[in-house]
Amino acid sequence: MSEEFKGLVAVVTGAGSGIGLAVAQHFHDNGAKVYGLDLQEGSMSPYAHFITCDIGNPTSVIAAFAELAKHTQVLDILANNAGVGATGTVEDATEEEWLRVLNINVVGTSRVSAAAISMLRKSKSPAIVNTCSIAATAGLPKRAVYSASKGAIMSLTLAMAADHVKEGIRVNCVNPGTADTPWVARLLSQAQDPVAERAALEARQPLGRLVSAPEVASAIAYLASPRQASTTGTILAVDGGMQGLRLPK
């Protein structure tokens, strides 16, 4: 443990479980005051103050930041982690699914960021870190809707970094590979043989295992840290080499 984030205020969306929970814990354990925005409190209570928020609903986002303003007027770190998954090809996806996923993953991230900007401007070391995905840069089968949404997040990260660099607000993103999260666990549970399916999934990873949520959280914390004052517009892969390595079979 350290005090790297002592005195700083962080907001983490999707902090109830998975990567978001690991991010909230990391910030808390290293000195930050953390506010977790999510639909349900989940397991965040030891690490973050829970504020109900549905990032897919503009009214809910406004209400969440009104509640946040009762506790703090300054925000130092925003970790945009909340999102939803989707499987299937463009033939499989319905119009409703496209709109739902893009509304939450892309527009939701934009909603939260827009609500946070005025508070971030009051910080001496403001940072936004978006959770993207390897799906933004690698053609993954049966991930059309999800991949499109994460590709948009990557582009949004760069655009936001350009828009706010003169204000000193740094904007970066992480691209996790296949992470060991509740969402992946749910997908595996739907297989005929979940144990065999997990073993096969791990075997496809260059490191021979899935990326852990704390590993992604550490990368997010690195990008959010005031020590990285010259790092903005960066896309940091945390994928065990899945994107960049081509290993012999």
Q: Model segments located where?
A:
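Short C-terminal tail/terminal secondary-structure segment
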Residues: S2, A138, A221, T232-K249
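Substrate-binding pocket helix/loop in short-chain dehydrogenase/reductase
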Residues: T89-V90, T94-L102, L201
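Active-site helix of classical SDR
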Residues: S113, S149
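Conserved glycine-rich cofactor-binding loop
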Residues: G16-S17
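Alpha-helical segment proximal to the catalytic Tyr-Lys
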Residues: S118, A162-K166, A229
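Active-site loop immediately N-terminal to the catalytic Tyr-X3-Lys motif
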Residues: E91, A138-A144, K166-E167, G208, ...
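Residue(s) in the substrate-gating loop at a strand-loop-helix junction
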Residues: S133
